[in-house]
A protein has these predicted regions:
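Glycine-aromatic micro-motifs
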Residues: 1-151
Length: 151
C-alpha cells in the first residue's frame, strides 16, 4: 500500500512536493467516522496545538491522497515526527468518488486538547483550499478558536 491520506498542512500539494517530489497527489476523499482536532499544546515546542484526528462516529475529515513513492517515505516520516514518536502511523479506509481506498495517516501519539495558533490554523485552511476541499469545510476550519500567541 502506497497511499498516504493527508488531512493537515500536507493537504497542500506544493508543500508535499517539497518533501516528497516523487509522490503525486492522486485524488481526494473523506475519512468517515473521524474528526479533525488539535493536540499536544506545549508538548512539541510549538506555540499552540497541532492537528490530529480521532475516531468520532458521524463525523468526517477531508483528505488528499498521495501515491507515496518509497524514496519519499522515510523523509515524510521524519518530517511528520513518526521517527521521534510524536505521531504514529495508522491504516484507514478513505471514501472517494471511485470507491474506498486503503491508506495510512499519521495521528498524534499524545492526548487530545489545546488550541492552534491563528497562523497554523490559517495554514491548514489554505492547504485544504488548495487541495479542493468544499468551501464549508474550509470555512469551518477558519472559524475554529485559536490560541493567543505569547509575547
Amino acid at each position: 500500500m502506497r497511499h498516504y491520506a493527508a488531512y493537515g498542512s500536507n493537504l497542500d500539494p506544493d508543500r508535499m512536493r517539497a518533501y516528497c517530489p516523487h509522490s503525486p497527489m492522486v485524488g481526494t476523499g473523506w475519512l468517515e467516522g473521524w474528526r479533525l482536532t488539535f493536540a499536544g499544546e506545549d508538548v512539541i515546542g510549538w506555540e499552540g496545538a497541532v492537528c490530529t484526528i480521532v475516531e468520532s462516529p458521524g463525523d468526517r475529515v477531508f483528505v488528499a491522497l498521495y501515491d507515496l513513492h518509497p524514496w519519499d517515505a522515510a523523509e515524510l516520516e521524519r518530517v511528520e515526527g513518526v521517527t521521534a514518536g510524536t505521531y504514529r502511523k495508522l491504516h484507514v479506509r478513505v471514501a472517494t468518488l471511485d470507491g474506498e481506498v486503503t491508506a495510512w495517516v499519521y495521528v498524534f501519539a499524545g492526548y487530545e486538547g489545546g488550541l492552534p495558533t491563528a497562523w497554523y490554523l490559517s495554514e491548514l485552511a489554505n492547504a485544504a483550499q488548495k487541495a479542493g476541499a468544499p468551501d464549508d469545510y474550509v470555512a469551518q476550519l477558519r472559524s475554529h478558536p485559536t490560541r493567543t500567541a505569547s509575547a
